């Protein structure tokens, strides 16, 4: 099986240059290029119409490099699901055989009350809450189970997100993985958007 690595931002290209990801001599190709004159983050525009428009503009694909390939793409988070859903559709339209998504943080269950980085007005703008409402009939029910990656509720949520986005597989990092990577105890890290707790809570 032949593998390729790809990326579209300066950080990834710098990583390639520093040989941090090329230790296995996997060739680097530009199958996706980022069109930067749009919004820096596609979830920032106020209206859904603007968000969908920006999401469609941000990435330019090279179909010849994607056709008949099994691809794995990483993203930092899923907020409303707008950009990722459109990007996945675009990858399949380019002929990708399979699309697998890996998210570097846990599912976002709460809007940020401190920085509001997701620019959401209510928690119901989050795709996770809309899925929970569909699963439970109530977007605020059993949230402690949906934030715990060891529960069946969490597994059901991830599966519903996978179907909504339309990918072959979807996985998230966990709070434990993030904590271990940072090297700090959980009570010193704000994980509010993941599990509803803030600084000082285990």
Task: Show the residue positions of the predicted features.
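PRPP-associated nucleotide enzymes
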Residues: 1-202
């Amino acid at each position: 099986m032949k593998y390729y690595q790809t990326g579209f931002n300066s950080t990834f290209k710098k990583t390639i240059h520093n040989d941090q990801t090329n230790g296995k001599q996997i060739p680097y190709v530009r199958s996706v290029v980022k069109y930067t004159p749009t919004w820096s983050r596609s979830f920032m525009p106020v209206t859904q119409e603007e968000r969908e428009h920006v999401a469609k503009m941000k990435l330019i694909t090279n179909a010849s490099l994607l056709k008949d390939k099994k691809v794995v793409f990483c993203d930092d988070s899923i907020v409303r699901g707008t950009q990722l859903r459109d990007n996945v559709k675009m990858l399949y339209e380019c002929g990708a055989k399979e699309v697998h998504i890996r998210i570097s943080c846990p599912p976002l269950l709460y809007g940020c009350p401190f920085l509001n980085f997701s620019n959401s007005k209510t928690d119901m703008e989050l795709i996770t809450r809309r899925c929970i409402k569909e699963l439970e009939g109530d977007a605020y029910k059993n949230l402690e189970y949906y934030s715990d990656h060891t529960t069946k509720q969490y597994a059901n949520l991830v599966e519903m997100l996978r179907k909504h986005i339309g990918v072959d597989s979807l996985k998230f990092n966990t709070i434990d993985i993030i904590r271990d990577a940072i090297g700090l105890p959980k009570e010193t890290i704000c994980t509010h958007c993941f599990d509803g707790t803030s600084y000082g809570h285990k």
